[in-house]
């Protein structure tokens, strides 16, 4: 089976979140299921610089204000189609936001262009590649099935994956014609969404099947509280919606081979984690205290991620004699609050505002516990990496965190299956209770090490998710 995957980022070439990890890891996992994936991504500077053996396979004379071409290329393990459109993608900043922190004003055209290219490829516009199935990811690719629907050409079945329902790609209605959509599309059963054009809504409306990245999140987004205005449509789609857990790239995330660690280890050599703990403390300016319970945070610094709750709970961390190491970037108010916390608690709280791949691995390999107090979490990869590395995840009772962490309640402790701590409600009080439970377990080395071994024994790879995606693909192509 040949699959065309369309998305706006792919690890390791360009990444702002979990979408890139999935786009980067799922194709290799699907190859074990006999499925060949080619991924279409925008030609950002970081992407075009990484290409090997790029060949122009389709020229587009005018694509939203300029000439473009689709190039077939390899980049590491990835088999790519790259939409080379310098007038849309050759810019500084990240894929969606300029260096001043403001969204690019032409994001509608930039990602409609990606969708146009995806629709062309889906219809077999490039000789030698006719996909059996289209897999579009998030709002940036949401118009692909819409274009195919309104253009009326024969097309392969489409799977549309929602990685985060909060990012919906809403744009003003006056752009309808400029985006190449007919007036008939501007209806409730089309692309119209709250008086504008909804890219994500279009994907949900026209895909043959919808997936999201955990079973729990699939349930949550069909409710009024979790649906963010789209719950009615999701309930209407009913059995077309599937929750398939994300996996983790276990070749990249492997404590036994990880070159970012000060000391590599496996489940039989957990004592080596102490070397990494000292390295985290030294790197981040924390007191070199081997006994202190070290909490790590590797996250986007945003309200969704509950970072403000961690700041509110700092007095509890003080009372526990714990340390906190934070790595991430995000909302300016949260960044400022973290800087204040660091200044008020030297040697006990540390934060590096930014992102360093090597440090993210070191924190997973050296922290005793990883905090993930999200207000909502479609799947989450941080807790998967934490368990892989024997760092106990402390997570809120939402989304994929529920599906991937086994709470250390008395039954799970007695059965010897606990892998982390879940807390609720998602509040400062709920998190504080989770912190105290974590400290109590940390004070019992036998229970703690058993939890670490349980966590590291979990299969968090892409093997099972790939099987589930393959089964869904086959169910659609066999109709």
Curated annotation (Swiss-Prot):
Q: What is this protein called?
A: Glycogen synthase
GO CC terms of this entry: cytosol
**EC number(s)?**
2.4.1.21
User: Which cystines does this chain contain?
Assistant: none
Q: What is the lineage of its organism?
A: Bacteria, Pseudomonadati, Pseudomonadota, Alphaproteobacteria, Acetobacterales
Q: Tell me the pathway.
A: Glycan biosynthesis; glycogen biosynthesis
Claim: DNA repair is one of the keywords in the record: no
Q: In which residues is ADP-alpha-D-glucose bound?
A: 15
Q: Name one GO molecular function term.
A: alpha-1,4-glucan glucosyltransferase (ADP-glucose donor) activity
Q: Which keywords annotate this record?
A: Glycogen biosynthesis, Glycosyltransferase, Transferase
What's an example GO BP annotation here?
glycogen biosynthetic process
Family, per entry: Belongs to the glycosyltransferase 1 family. Bacterial/plant glycogen synthase subfamily.
Q: Please, which domain of life does this record's source organism belong to?
A: Bacteria
Write the gene name.
glgA
Question: Would the keyword Nucleotide-binding turn up in this protein's UniProt record?
Answer: no
